[in-house]
Amino acid sequence: MILYRLTRSKYVESAWSGTGAKLYGGRWHNIGRPAVYVATSVSLAVLEVLVHVGDDELLTDFALLSIDIPENQIDILDIDTLPSDWNAPVPSTCTMEIGSEWFEVSHSIGLVVPSAIVPYENNVILNPMAKDFHKYINTVKRLDFGIDSRLVKAKK
């Protein structure tokens, strides 16, 4: 499964470490645990960044990264078990607990979760501490990438 990550170019070297997620947490895990959030399409990767960007200045110098993780290394979250507020603008502790529990019990590298922005599309949470994660770093490809500034203007 080819997965995509859009990151500031200055963070490319640490893009697969999970350090940012460890420091700040995320919708699907608690602070203190390394995690790497990726999307199943380039357009979703862009939207996942764009939702947090409010300034044309921030749209420069991005890198698009891809990684190839075998599907047998990826679990799928049963969305029918999610609470009604799973996609609230401010992540609920319930989704953080769901993801954190997966990190504790799973031996897989990734967990497919729905996007809170486009619920019919998926993100994947990668566990950089998983036993075999390092084997797939050599599949990473980089392409410099710019986001069309009209997308931010449309948000205003």
Swiss-Prot record:
Its EC number is 2.4.2.-. The keyword Nucleotidyltransferase applies. Keywords: NAD, Nucleotidyltransferase, Toxin-antitoxin system, Transferase. InterPro entries: RES_dom. Changing Y37A: Significantly decreased toxicity in E.coli, in liquid culture is not neutralized by antitoxin Xre, partially neutralized when grown on solid medium. It is an enzyme of class 2 (transferase). GO terms for molecular function: nucleotidyltransferase activity. Pfam families: RES (PF08808). The keyword rRNA-binding does not apply. Belongs to the MbcT/ParT/Res family. Homodimer. Forms a complex with cognate antitoxin Xre. Toxic component of a type II toxin-antitoxin (TA) system. Expression in E.coli inhibits cell growth; bacteriostasis is neutralized by expression of cognate antitoxin Xre. Expression in E.coli leads to almost complete depletion of intracellular NAD(+): NAD(+) levels are partially restored when coexpressed with antitoxin Xre. This is Toxin Res. It comes from Photorhabdus laumondii subsp. laumondii (strain DSM 15139 / CIP 105565 / TT01). The gene is res.
